[in-house]
Swiss-Prot record:
Protein's UniProt name: Aminomethyltransferase, mitochondrial
GO process terms (BP): glycine catabolic process
Main subcellular localisation: mitochondrion
Record field: transmembrane: none
Keywords, in A-Z order: Aminotransferase, Mitochondrion, Transferase, Transit peptide
Oligomeric and partner information: The glycine cleavage system is composed of four proteins: P, T, L and H.
GO cellular component assignments: glycine cleavage complex; mitochondrion
Localization in the cell: Mitochondrion
Pfam families to which the protein is assigned, alphabetical: GCV_T, GCV_T_C
Amino acid sequence: MRGGLWQLGQSITRRLAQADKKTIGRRCFASDADLKKTVLYDFHVVNGGKMVPFAGWSMPIQYKDSIMDSTVNCRENGSLFDVSHMCGLSLKGKDTIPFLEKLVIADVAGLAPGTGSLTVFTNEKGGAIDDSVVTKVTNDHIYLVVNAGCRDKDLAHIEEHMKSFKSKGGDVSWHIHDERSLLALQGPLAAPVLQYLTKDDLSKMYFGEFRVLDINGAPCFLTRTGYTGEDGFEISVPSENALDLAKALLEKSEGKIRLTGLGARDSLRLEAGLCLYGNDMEQHTTPVEAGLTWAIGKRRRAEGGFLGAEVILKQIEEGPKIRRVGFFSSGPPPRSHSEIQDSNGQNIGEITSGGFSPCLKKNIAMGYVKTGNHKAGTNVKIVIRGKSYDGVVTKMPFVPTKYYKP
């Protein structure tokens, strides 16, 4: 088991570093002095956080628990993640929705106020610039959270199109929430523990919904969402209140909710079948190929109007040439870039994320295969260090999701 734990930690570290390199380039592998720190940095260190460079930040990859134990504890009890390296921003103005709908695939206009959805920023070729959660606070206020490794290019992309939009009379402005920190509270104890710290009734707040409310005496943006497949919340809190909130959440859980690092977060999202940008989705990958067609609203499919719509809508109609799928496999855990072959030894694709599942106690992976080889039950070979091992295409998520829905 010790060898399996070591392999799990090493594979996750490599996977995060690889996604980091692809999305942000060399500049993030700087000296410790050049790395940014969240307001909880000292709190992480005091609590045994193993700090590593990620997206230009010094972030905890794990604490005293193993990545395997942290993953299982999140699903059985709960986890508290510091995800303040991610970028929250607000778009405001009467033309905010038509502006944003030029850049993303979501039916933002169709969202009810106080609800959100996963979406994708696309380029002119239909490729993914980044994935993001978009929330309609009101018809004139949209709240977004984008990936840390994509922050610079995302903001440059939005700003470039905003300047053009405003030059034609469009009413839209933005605010980047650098004054706030972001905590992710995930797992079955997330809601009951958070309920201790707010007067709002969380039992009537469902997956994908958003509220502005008081938590532990601080004005917070609360979204019922996450990156683990579990029920949970992302809490945008004024940075001066972040430490007190983190301590209060851990205290109220009586030790059952634990501080959890990027390692277990990656393991959890892989078990949930969720993409890691830079690995499972890149600028040459379309949302259709990535299995995110469901995120393109019916109206958007009919009207288009977003960057790359011609390419994406054609793929919806005719089908993509490649598709993201899940795998179970034998042998060593698959790694990113491991070759996928059919039963005749012909190349049909490539692994993008893979590892040992702490919850299923078996190898899981996702990757892209040529259409025709994508159906669940299809037998494949996965090549690892020159040797081929048996694999089978399987449906995702690997671990059933537990989102809180009415």
